[in-house]
């Protein structure tokens, strides 16, 4: 019985876009894991997930030790890793972002107080190059965890839906996404009443959104995004049912796991009696550092009062203090509509925006919202400097690279600095997705763009601050964005009063409000539509009307922030003199060889002569980059002379260069690749009419000589005559007399 393989299937109906089948299987692979499941997408993409738990809890931890790892195996796409050792190394950015997509809905679904180490490892074993594996991995991870006998309130269904030709399509392919206006990953649980509790959303507009909207497609406004969340619910329900069917056949009974509650009720009651009034007072201080100093002081008073009574329970006192703080903050918001720093629920903190914040760089901007301070810095370079990707994705290069740094001093602490953590990679990716839809195309702006966001101060949503700083920095660097983008972080607090749930949406949340709220979501966009959205909630479903109102509230805030940013910069600046100048030239594909020359001789010569860097694409597009515009233009003129020549005509005059001498004359280069013969009989004119025995006596290689084309024969060979000083003027005079 133990070796029996069990299956369950979820069929997703996309109407005119056909069906997708997600098949779950357990009992065949990874049998020693507490729970293992394989998820197949159309029997072509395969993800194995294994969930294991430590035998003993880590009692000294004050958090739940859940680890999610995604292992991309290059054999899944029939590739050998491109690294020196030809072996997979550290996880790719795609893998790290998928880890976060799995962790976010899974973590809150475990029983509160669980302290056993839980590890979920999802391995991508087979991948159709047109499929996206991330949502398949969410479902596989949920299924394996559901089977593992853990205190887990799943299953969780994850689906990607994209708005294509006015229809929300589930599990779209890469090919289908090329026509999508909006793309979102939604994860949630099926509730007993038949509804779906949405737990996580990760969404973005696409590179083609603006082009598609201009062509008549529906813009991804807040209303459209809310409709997309509703469209995802039936798909999530089908996925949850398939996982539940599998669990009914093969799940282990839930084991006995010790739960370490943060505190007992007696500690909370004693703490409330001892310091509630002082704590309430401390929570009205507007400044973050002053408030935290006072909160620490009140916490010390609480410890002094309670420790004699609760000896050895210091951790409980600390946890109860956090819980009391949370309830007081929430109560004040619900009842008085007043927040920690004294703002109303829709108020935005003081904004400041400036460009050219640091010297010499190609573009920079400083954006401040309250105590959150972000420096955005833009660097431009040749397209050959774009990021080369060696992943399972069919995308092999990335022209816009957004890096986010969060140093410990941004919150006044010490800590490790160095390689980016998962959180930094996630925040950078969110800011990148917010900006990508408004970037100019490669043809319009042939540059690789690296954008760095430095979080210099943090108190609430540095990722959305990064979007604002990046927009201004890119404009300062001269990048012609299609529209400016701003972002805002929102929170939601709910409380039941007299049997009715009241919801309050908060605009521009602080770090503390993020921790104490029921939902936080970040929205970035232009004046017209949403470009990126990230949502996490602890609630079992948010009424559609509440979500719609919160999205509208976010839009109002975004428009206000855009106005402030536009006062600092509203159009692209002139490019920095320190930025390279890049121009393009298109040549016939059959001329590429001529431009390169034998063994690269011609292209190397052009680069050496002009100081420009040249990159040639297979379609005949040539990118020419140089530190000075005149160098790039010189290279373009030379390339055009070779590959797009204007055919010389009889009577045209050129200042040519002697490239070779023979016994019968000199070959003179007029244009790159165009030489003509100046016969020895014509060279006599340059020697005052005297007989010339040796061409070298009059013209050496490298000499400049003014010539005129006298004849072009049937094979295109050019015969030249010299233009002797004074001769040309006399001829013109004679013509006039005639």
Swiss-Prot record:
The keyword Ribonucleoprotein does not apply. It catalyses: RNA(n+1) + phosphate = RNA(n) + a ribonucleoside 5'-diphosphate. InterPro entries: ExoRNase_PH_dom1 (IPR001247), ExoRNase_PH_dom2 (IPR015847), ExoRNase_PH_dom2_sf (IPR036345), GPSI/PNP (IPR014069), KH_dom (IPR004087), KH_dom_type_1 (IPR004088), KH_dom_type_1_sf (IPR036612), NA-bd_OB-fold (IPR012340). GO terms for cellular component: cytosol. Keywords: Cytoplasm, Magnesium, Metal-binding, Nucleotidyltransferase, RNA-binding, Transferase. It comes from the Bacteria. Its EC number is 2.7.7.8. Gene3D superfamilies: GHMP Kinase, N-terminal domain, K Homology domain, type 1, Nucleic acid-binding proteins. The keyword Ribonucleoprotein does not apply. GO terms for biological process: mRNA catabolic process; RNA processing. Residues 651-723 form the S1 motif domain. It is found in: Cytoplasm. Pfam families: KH_1, PNPase, RNase_PH, RNase_PH_C, S1. Residues 580-639 form the KH domain. It is an enzyme of class 2 (transferase). GO terms for molecular function: 3'-5'-RNA exonuclease activity; magnesium ion binding; polyribonucleotide nucleotidyltransferase activity; RNA binding. Mg(2+) binds at residues 514, 520. Belongs to the polyribonucleotide nucleotidyltransferase family. Involved in mRNA degradation. Catalyzes the phosphorolysis of single-stranded polyribonucleotides processively in the 3'- to 5'-direction. HAMAP family: PNPase. This is Polyribonucleotide nucleotidyltransferase. It comes from Streptomyces avermitilis (strain ATCC 31267 / DSM 46492 / JCM 5070 / NBRC 14893 / NCIMB 12804 / NRRL 8165 / MA-4680).
């Amino acid at each position: 019985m133990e070796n029996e393989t069990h299956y369950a299937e979820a069929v997703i109906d996309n109407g005119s876009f056909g069906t997708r089948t997600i098949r779950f299987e357990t009992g065949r692979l990874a049998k020693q894991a507490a729970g293992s499941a394989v998820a197949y997408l159309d029997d072509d993409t395969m993800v194995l997930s294994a969930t294991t738990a430590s035998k003993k809890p880590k009692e000294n931890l004050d958090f739940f030790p859940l680890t999610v790892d995604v292992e991309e195996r290059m054999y899944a796409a029939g590739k050998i890793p491109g690294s020196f050792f030809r072996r997979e190394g550290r996880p790719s950015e795609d893998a790290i972002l998928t880890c976060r997509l799995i962790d976010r809905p899974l973590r809150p679904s475990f029983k509160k107080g669980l302290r056993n180490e839980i590890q979920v490892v999802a391995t991508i074993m087979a991948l159709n190059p047109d499929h996206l594996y991330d949502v398949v991995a969410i479902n596989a991870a949920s299924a394996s965890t559901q089977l593992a006998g853990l205190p887990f309130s799943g299953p969780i269904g994850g689906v990607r839906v994209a708005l294509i030709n006015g229809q929300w399509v589930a599990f779209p392919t890469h090919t289908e996404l090329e026509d999508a206006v909006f793309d979102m990953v939604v994860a949630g649980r099926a509730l007993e009443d038949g509804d779906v509790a949405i737990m996580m959303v990760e969404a973005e507009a696409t590179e083609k959104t603006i082009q598609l909207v201009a062509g008549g497609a529906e813009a991804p406004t807040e209303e459209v995004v809310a409709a997309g969340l509703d469209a995802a619910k039936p798909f999530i329900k089908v996925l949850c049912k398939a996982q539940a069917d599998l669990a009914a056949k093969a799940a282990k009974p839930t084991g006995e796991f010790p739960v370490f509650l943060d505190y007992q009720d007696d500690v909370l009651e004693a703490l409330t009696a001892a310091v509630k009034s002082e704590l309430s007072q401390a929570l009205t201080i507007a400044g973050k550092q002053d408030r935290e100093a006072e909160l620490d002081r009140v916490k010390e008073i609480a410890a002094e009062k309670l420790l004699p009574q609760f000896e050895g329970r210091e951790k409980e006192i600390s946890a109860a203090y956090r819980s009391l703080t949370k309830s007081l903050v929430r109560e004040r918001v619900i009842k008085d509509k007043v927040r920690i720093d004294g703002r109303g629920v829709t108020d935005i903190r003081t904004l400041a925006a400036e460009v050219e914040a640091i010297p010499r760089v190609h573009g920079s901007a400083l954006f401040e919202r309250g105590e959150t301070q972000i420096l955005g810095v833009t660097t431009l370079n040749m397209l050959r400097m774009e990021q080369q990707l060696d992943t399972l994705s069919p995308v092999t290069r990335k022209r816009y690279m957004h890096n986010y740094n969060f140093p410990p001093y941004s919150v006044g602490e010490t800590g490790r600095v160095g390689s980016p953590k998962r959180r930094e990679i996630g925040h950078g990716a969110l800011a990148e997705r917010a900006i990508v839809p408004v970037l100019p195309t490669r043809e319009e702006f042939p540059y690789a763009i690296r954008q760095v966001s430095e979080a210099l101060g943090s108190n609430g949503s540095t990722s959305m601050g990064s979007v604002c700083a990046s927009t201004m920095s890119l404009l300062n660097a001269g990048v012609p964005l299609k529209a400016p983008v701003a972002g805002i972080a929102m929170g939601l607090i709910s409380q039941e009063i007299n049997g009715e749930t009241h919801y309050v949406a908060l605009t521009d949340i602080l770090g503390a409000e993020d921790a104490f709220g029921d939902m936080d979501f970040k929205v970035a966009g232009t004046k017209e539509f949403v470009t990126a959205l990230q949502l996490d909630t602890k609630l079992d479903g948010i009424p559609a009307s509440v979500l719609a109102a919160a999205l509208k509230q976010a839009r109002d805030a975004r428009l206000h922030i855009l106005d402030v940013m536009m006062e600092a910069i509203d159009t692209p600046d002139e490019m920095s003199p320190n930025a390279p100048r890049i121009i393009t030239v298109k040549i016939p594909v059959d001329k590429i060889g001529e431009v390169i020359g034998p063994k690269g001789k011609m292209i190397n010569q052009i680069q050496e002569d002009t100081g420009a860097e040249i990159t040639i694409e297979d379609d005949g597009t040539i990118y020419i980059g140089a530190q000075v515009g005149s160098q790039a233009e010189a290279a373009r003129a030379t390339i055009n002379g070779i590959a797009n020549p204007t055919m010389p005509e009889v009577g045209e005059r050129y200042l040519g260069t002697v490239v070779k001498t023979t016994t019968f004359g000199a070959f003179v280069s007029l244009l790159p690749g165009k030489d003509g013969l100046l016969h020895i009989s014509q060279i006599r004119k340059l020697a005052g009419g005297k007989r010339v025995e040796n061409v070298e006596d009059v013209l050496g290689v490298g000499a400049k000589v003014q010539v005129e084309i006298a004849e072009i024969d049937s094979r295109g060979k050019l015969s030249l005559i010299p233009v002797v000083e004074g001769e040309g003027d006399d001829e013109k005079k004679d013509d006039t007399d005639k």
